[in-house]
């Protein structure tokens, strides 16, 4: 079933067929292999009994779920906000997409908190960081996020208007006061709370590093980059979308919570292109997370390098065989030139904090 909105705002979908599909295609193409590799590397950390690997594994899993939901949303934007897969698919892909935006933010804050406890209080909270505790925290996050994002599944998934839009999981103006209040809650609990935790952990890590004489300068820089990178990535990726979502919701509530088109539509129509662009920008977090993983687990970089080196070696070996079958010299290069096969390895040391 769908809901027809007779007094809908006349939003312009002209830019929707350009920026969001381009970003989604980029995230899908690069993010899928990167997060599969990060998922495998995080699993290796879990097998070694490292609690940080649990959070990174769940972060990669969340990113992969979001990435897998992108193809139908790409088609939605290419059609200029016309959902063509029915209300059931809209609920499914909308739920997966929006839930994993907030699951990702929650696990970024877990990584920050874990690094803070490891550096600032390694002996004071020994029971807070075993792998079973990390698994319990992860399960709690999934349950809370799934429950918090479930209510929209019970309402109307699709909203049609007289401007030939078939919106999925969104409407312009907002569908009611309850939706506006829920949006404010998402901004506060789903974005600002995790981001605040990251900032507090960053400040605490800086204090702990200044007071530590045993930590090498190189490791100080790495921990500092990780501690700053987490809140910066969250702010740059999630911040614009949540700022516009909060603005839309507050204006709607201040205006009396009416769904009638009127003064509120002027704001909705102005914000619409930036709002959809900011939502697409939020998915770039799926590309940043694997890079942050390498900062969080320097020992795993060698494992990742081995896989990449193996793939490169396999590809180059395949090219050599193909060249030989075509009558070449079997080297895969020109005459008198050989390929130097480089085996990529880690630096042989790990710094576990």
From Swiss-Prot:
One of its GO terms (molecular function) is G protein-coupled receptor activity. SUPFAM superfamilies: Family A G protein-coupled receptor-like. The keyword Methyltransferase does not apply. Glycans are attached at residue 164. Gene3D superfamilies: Rhodopsin 7-helix transmembrane proteins (1.20.1070.10). Changing residue 119 to A: Decreased proton-induced G-protein coupled receptor activity. Changing residue 159 to A: Decreased proton-induced G-protein coupled receptor activity. Activated by a network of residues, such as His-159, His-165 and His-276. His-159 is unique to Xenopus and contributes to the more acidic optimal pH range compared to mammals. These residues connect the extracellular-facing cavity to Glu-145, a conserved charged residue buried in the transmembrane core of the receptor. Residues 157-172 are annotated as: Extracellular loop 2 (ECL2). Keywords: Cell membrane, Disulfide bond, G-protein coupled receptor, Glycoprotein, Membrane, Receptor, Transducer, Transmembrane, Transmembrane helix. The record marks 145 as: Required for activation. One of its GO terms (cellular component) is plasma membrane. It is a multi-pass membrane protein. Belongs to the G-protein coupled receptor 1 family. A multitude of proton-sensing residues, which include extracellular histidine residues or triad of buried acidic residues, contribute to activation of the G-protein coupled receptor activity and pH sensitivity. This is G-protein coupled receptor 4.
